[in-house]
């Protein structure tokens, strides 16, 4: 009986130990002067948004890119090659959120969630994204079902908090930073999966 228990425990260990910690893509961003963050992407909720982000990371689009906007207690925004909120990758993708007719994305905009920035047009997102800095009713009312949330910071929220606390905002109305914060590098581990983006 003792031998049977040992064998069963060994089998459980083998099956459990062989399982990957993550199946979803994991993005690692190195932020100059601040540190490293890791973001888990959620293709279950926003597959094309995730595919777009993965493709941009793999192309090196975000290397040397910046965070250009900070509204403390609200969002930190980046991903614009122009560094001023007007740029993008030269194309856009369809917005995967409920108010745009996409019903599979029920992610809420809570602390650490990453979501796509866009203009007034629902299908205008390209490369700009924002990270949510707090859990409030105002944030929920402003963003939930209106923007395509697609991932979450799973490591390094202390880095993001440090940016929120120490970066100097030049214009409190727009959130424009006095000095943009550089994303030195961004890499992604897709665990062998391929992600193909459909452009709008």
Model-assigned labels for residue ranges:
Residues 1-4:
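Positively charged n-region of N-terminal signal peptides that target proteins for export
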Residues 8-200:
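Cyclophilin-like peptidyl-prolyl cis-trans isomerases
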């Amino acid at each position: 009986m003792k031998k049977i228990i040992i064998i069963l425990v060994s089998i459980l260990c083998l099956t459990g130990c062989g399982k990957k910690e993550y199946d979803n893509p994991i993005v690692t961003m190195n932020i100059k002067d601040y540190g490293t963050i890791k973001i888990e992407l959620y293709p279950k909720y926003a597959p094309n948004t995730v595919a777009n982000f993965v493709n941009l990371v793999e192309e090196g689009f975000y290397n040397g890119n910046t965070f250009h906007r900070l509204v403390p207690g609200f969002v930190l925004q980046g991903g614009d090659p122009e560094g001023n909120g007007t740029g993008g990758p030269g194309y856009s993708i369809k917005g995967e959120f409920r108010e745009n007719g996409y019903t599979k994305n029920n992610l809420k905009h809570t602390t650490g969630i990453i979501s796509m920035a866009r203009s007034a047009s629902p299908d205008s997102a390209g490369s700009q994204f924002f990270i949510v800095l707090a859990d409030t009713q105002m944030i929920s009312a402003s963003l939930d079902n209106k923007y395509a949330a697609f991932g979450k910071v799973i490591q390094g929220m202390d880095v993001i908090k440090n940016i929120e606390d120490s970066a100097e905002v030049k214009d409190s109305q727009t959130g424009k930073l006095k000095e943009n914060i550089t994303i030195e590098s961004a890499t992604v581990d897709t665990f062998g999966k391929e992600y193909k983006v459909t452009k709008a």
